[in-house]
Amino acid sequence: MNKKDTCEIFCYDEEKVNRIQGDLKTIDIVSVAQMLKAIADENRAKITYALCQDEELCVCDIANIIGITVANASHHLRTLHKQGIVRYRKEGKLAFYSLDDEHIRQIMMIVLEHKKEVNVNV
């Protein structure tokens, strides 16, 4: 077992632990985790990236861009919508999707930039 990345003795900073535990009780970390989990799916990450590149895309465009069926794209878009990542508007029989706000674009761009800086293999 590689012990280079772990403490060799058990001790902790009680003040830091108590402060951060208190902070965690005041935020909705479960919702944050659910939002990040939604984007963590490969197809949903591709959809999010596509919507970073163009302000608004219809479901058919998205399906073609990432190479899945319209039904599958709709399923992924519903998941993203439920998590507040995308919004949509109807125009006749077409549904157009966009990112919910600039924060989502920033998150995606920051993660992409970070990926360039670190050597992480999946």
Swiss-Prot record:
**Taking every annotated instance into account, which residue ranges of this chain make up the domain HTH arsR-type?**
24-119
Q: Does the keyword Lyase apply?
A: no
Q: Which residues form a coiled coil?
A: none
Q: Where does Cd(2+) bind?
A: 7, 11, 58, 60
DNA-binding region residues: the ranges are 59-78
Q: State the source organism's domain of life.
A: Bacteria
What Pfam families does this protein's entry cite? HTH_5 (PF01022)
Q: Under which name does UniProt file this protein?
A: Cadmium resistance transcriptional regulatory protein CadC
